[in-house]
């Protein structure tokens, strides 16, 4: 159980997944390349390490150094590298011109793990539009409102007031 994973999250979700669901997830590749785009969940090396930021001993999220970010991209020739995991929308341009983008989260605007807390301040779905231009990749981060009521009701029904609050407000108090 990696230190930044919420065991309650797994406990809530696992009973809802059939063996077929779990098999499908296990069969997914750790990374994927589509043309000039490289995709991974967290970093190219593993599924739980944050690529663009880290959690300080005090529980704050801080940016990783550019050399650390770039070292994780070594050997990847694609010009656009997509990652996630942190639920924080951000982009970093590497010294060689490649761009790393985390689009944010569509359905989890915050969470409180054992080691840190993430809040976005709004319940909106977040994603990124990406266009390849003559001068490189153009990124437009989007923040879109949606009806969170069904997810909030489900969180409350599952006795997760923390999830209900963050889904409804984008905040954890």
What are these regions (language model features)?
Residues 77-80, 138:
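Short active-site oxyanion
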Residues 1-3, 92-95:
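Metal-dependent catalytic neighborhoods of phosphoester/phosphodiester hydrolases
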Residues 36-43, 100-104:
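Active-site-proximal beta-strand elements of phosphoester/diester hydrolases
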Residues 1-35, 45-46, 51-77:
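Active-site neighborhood of divalent metal-dependent phosphoester bond hydrolases
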Residues 45-47, 80-94, 108-112:
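Active-site environment of divalent metal-dependent phosphoester hydrolases
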Residues 25, 41, 85, 104, ...:
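Divalent metal-coordination and catalytic microenvironments
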Residues 93-173:
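Acidic, His/Gly-rich catalytic cores of divalent-metal-dependent hydrolytic chemistry
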Residues 23-27, 84-85, 121-123:
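Short solvent-exposed loop/turn micro-motifs enriched in small/polar/acidic residues
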């Amino acid at each position: 159980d990696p230190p930044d994973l919420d065991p309650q999250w797994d406990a809530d979700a696992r009973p809802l997944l059939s063996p077929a669901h779990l098999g499908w997830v296990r069969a997914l590749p750790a990374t994927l390349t589509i043309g000039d785009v490289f995709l991974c969940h967290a970093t190219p090396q593993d599924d739980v390490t944050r690529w663009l930021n880290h959690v300080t001993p005090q529980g704050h999220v801080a940016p990783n150094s550019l050399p650390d970010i770039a070292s994780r991209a070594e050997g990847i020739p694609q010009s656009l590298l997509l990652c996630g995991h942190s639920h924080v929308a951000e982009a970093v341009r590497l010294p060689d011109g490649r761009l790393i983008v985390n689009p944010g989260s569509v359905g989890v605007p915050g969470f409180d793990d054992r080691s840190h807390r993430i809040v976005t301040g709004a319940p909106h779905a977040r994603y990124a539009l990406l266009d390849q231009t003559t001068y490189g990749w153009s990124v437009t981060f989007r923040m879109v409102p949606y009806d969170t009521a069904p997810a909030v009701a489900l969180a409350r029904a599952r006795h997760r007031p923390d999830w209900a609050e963050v889904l409804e407000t984008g905040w954890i108090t």
